[in-house]
Amino acid sequence: METRPRLLSRIHWLGHDAFRIDGPPVIYLDPWQVPADAPKADLILISHEHFDHCSPEDVNRLRQPDTVIIGSPAAAAKIKGAQ
């Protein structure tokens, strides 16, 4: 069973409101200004469509062919392939 400190060590603040949870799976929350060498995403969650929460450039850099992207309808409209 995973201990709490180990779980917390997998959560990374990326600046502003962006976070990455290392897995597997690798999960991003509101990726914005993510470093170019960041791990690819298995799941991307977007809270809303504002530019600093819904960055098509960052999403496209992080996504893989099987990455699941979930966001509000307004956010999904900005990201091709989002649900």
Predicted regions and their residues:
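Active-site metal-binding motif and surrounding structural segment of the metallo-beta-lactamase
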Residues: 32-77
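Conserved beta-strand hairpin/beta-sheet module of binuclear metal-dependent hydrolase folds
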Residues: 1-39, 43
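Metallo-beta-lactamase
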Residues: 2-8, 14, 70-83
